Swiss-Prot record:
Keywords: Cell inner membrane, Cell membrane, Electron transport, Membrane, Translocase, Transmembrane, Transmembrane helix, Transport
Summary of the function given for this chain in its UniProt record: Part of a membrane-bound complex that couples electron transfer with translocation of ions across the membrane.
Chief localization: membrane
Pfam families for this protein: Rnf-Nqr
Record's subunit section: The complex is composed of six subunits: RnfA, RnfB, RnfC, RnfD, RnfE and RnfG.
Protein origin, superkingdom: Bacteria
Compartments it resides in: Cell inner membrane
Coiled coil: none
Keyword Cell inner membrane: yes
Enzyme class: translocase
One Gene Ontology biological process: electron transport chain
Name the UniProt record assigns to this protein: Ion-translocating oxidoreductase complex subunit A
One GO CC term, this protein: plasma membrane
């Protein structure tokens, strides 16, 4: 049980997918201008990453390895992610039309979020078991969500701040992301995974 908790904390804080491994930067910059959009994207990403990690493990263990089709790993993971995203899009459309409109193009873009594919491939490379794969995917999604929501709150504050003209917009956002990354470096050594 302690190993699972350490894996979760390590994935969320120490090896954060956005600030340490630099995966998922496109949605990180694209969806972070408003906090409500970031929260919606976070829920969708948590669901997709966790489910994609689970299904990728099952596809690898019960389909690709027994049939000696390991060379199709990346392609099969992309297919699994696309199916999970389509399912998520249908669920969000049925349950919350306002969130569906708010997320707009960003929901289908989860398919191309390299963090989702990165989680599946890292699960395979790190030889995680069933529960470890789920926890790793969930932790990566929680870390992504934490950083995305924090960053969106900071960007909303910066929109109302007196920022010099050359730094307005993307420039100050990149500086802020860099400072967040430095702050997360403080967690290095907290957990060895």
């Amino acid at each position: 049980m302690t190993d699972y908790l350490l894996l979760l904390v390590g994935t969320v804080l120490v090896n954060n997918f956005v600030l340490v491994q630099f995966l998922g930067l496109c949605p990180f910059m694209g969806v972070s201008s408003r906090t409500e959009t970031a929260i919606g994207m976070s829920f969708a990403t948590v669901f997709v990453m966790t489910l994609a990690s689970l299904l990728s493990y099952l596809v690898t263990t019960y389909l690709l390895v027994p049939l000696n089709l390991e060379y199709l790993t990346t392609m099969s993971f992309i297919l699994v992610i696309a199916v999970v995203v389509q399912f998520t899009e249908m669920v969000v459309h049925k349950t919350s039309a306002s969130l569906y409109r708010l997320l707009g193009i960003f929901l289908p873009l989860i398919t191309t979020n390299c963090a989702v594919l990165g989680v599946a491939l890292l699960n395979l490379r790190l030889q995680h078991g069933f529960f470890e794969s789920i926890i790793y995917g969930f932790g990566a999604a929680l870390g992504f969500s934490l950083v995305l929501i924090m960053f969106s709150a900071m960007r909303e504050k910066l929109a109302n701040a007196d920022v010099p003209a050359p730094f307005k917009g993307t420039a100050i956002a990149m500086i802020t992301a860099g400072l967040m990354s430095l702050a997360f470096l403080g967690f290095t050594g907290l957990v060895k995974i």
